[in-house]
UniProtKB/Swiss-Prot annotation:
Family listed: Belongs to the lyssavirus matrix protein family.
Protein name: Matrix protein
GO MF annotation: an example: structural constituent of virion
GO annotation, biological process: viral budding via host ESCRT complex
Domain characteristics, as noted in the entry: Late-budding domains (L domains) are short sequence motifs essential for viral particle budding. They recruit proteins of the host ESCRT machinery (Endosomal Sorting Complex Required for Transport) or ESCRT-associated proteins. Matrix protein contains one L domain: a PPXY motif which potentially interacts with the WW domain 3 of NEDD4 E3 ubiquitin ligase (Potential).
Source species: Rabies virus (strain silver-haired bat-associated) (RABV)
InterPro entries in alphabetical order: Rhabdo_M, Rhabdovirus_M_sf
Sorted UniProt keywords: Host cytoplasm, Host membrane, Host-virus interaction, Membrane, Phosphoprotein, Viral budding, Viral budding via the host ESCRT complexes, Viral envelope protein, Viral matrix protein, Viral release from host cell, Virion
Gene3D superfamilies, per the entry: Rhabdovirus matrix protein M2 (3.10.460.20)
Note: Most abundant protein in the virion.
Gene giving rise to this polypeptide: M
Amino acid sequence: MNFLRKIVKTCRDEDTQKPPLVSAPPDDDDLWLPPPEYIPLKEITGKKNMRNFCVNGEVKVCGPNGYSFRTLRHILRSFDEIYSGNQRMIGLVKVVVGLALSGAPVPEGMNWVYKLRRTLIFQWADSRGPLEGEELEYSQEITWDDDTEFVGLEIRVSARQCHIQGRIWCINMNSRACQFWSDMSLQTQRSEEDKDSSVLLE
């Protein structure tokens, strides 16, 4: 029986280093209200510390018995403690992960794959964000497991500064992306140059 359980819970053949585990979600995990600091973006008028990034994001969800967004949101609440990438680009990664998971998944074996490929405009507060010309290649696995459910996330994000026309990254304060950003504690503040945009503090 234990052998069968191991097969059902394994998403990949190779047994690599075990990713970090996240504790069980509380019963009230689905209660959520959009945080007031998230402002729908229109057109960014300020030029201060603003950069376009060509981003590729992929979130692969392994849930052999299915999965719920309640569980995904609970996993992402521990993102700051688990994140192993470049700290100067953690805000960018949170934006990309939230947008990717807001899209439609494509089934791939026992997994569901969410992908995002886009040019996005990011604006950071003074002395925040990546260095000029800095690129990102980030990959990490996170799992959540108890006696009734197993869910694994495999996150990949790549980003490089580019000069292609970018898009704003939050147009609806009630969108699922904003919900994930709230779960990941995305740190933003209202831009001093443009009241309709937010700048990243991370």
